[in-house]
């Protein structure tokens, strides 16, 4: 649905917004875990959880409205739960991948002017591998910042990202 284009579907004529009481502790979403550390479960996320998480992400990552974000993590990952809210709150454009592919990530960085992403170590390795056969200058040099999540990246990988990609 697109606001402005699909208003008749979203709010039929004659309807009006229903009154509601604001409650920062009310459940906003239920996110389902994959069960990597325990049995899978639905986790209730409150409006306050979302706000606090978004604010923390934005401050920690140094995000501004001049950034362009590339999603490489699944939306069910903990960064996937919080980062879209931080980005939307700042007005940051968000670029989404259908599947993780190192060369496609480099293309999106080049095409969309990506400045920031979060990625698992395996994704970083895929980008490093794709960069070896990339023709021309690596896109995003001295512009892209990356937060690696899911597991600590090996020191050699960090050094390669800085040296070969020019990313921070």
Where are each of the predicted segments found?
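Structural detector for helix-capping/boundary residues
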Residues: 25, 47-48, 73, 112, ...
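Conserved adenylate-forming
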Residues: 1-4, 89-93, 98-168
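ANL superfamily adenylate-forming
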Residues: 1-24, 131
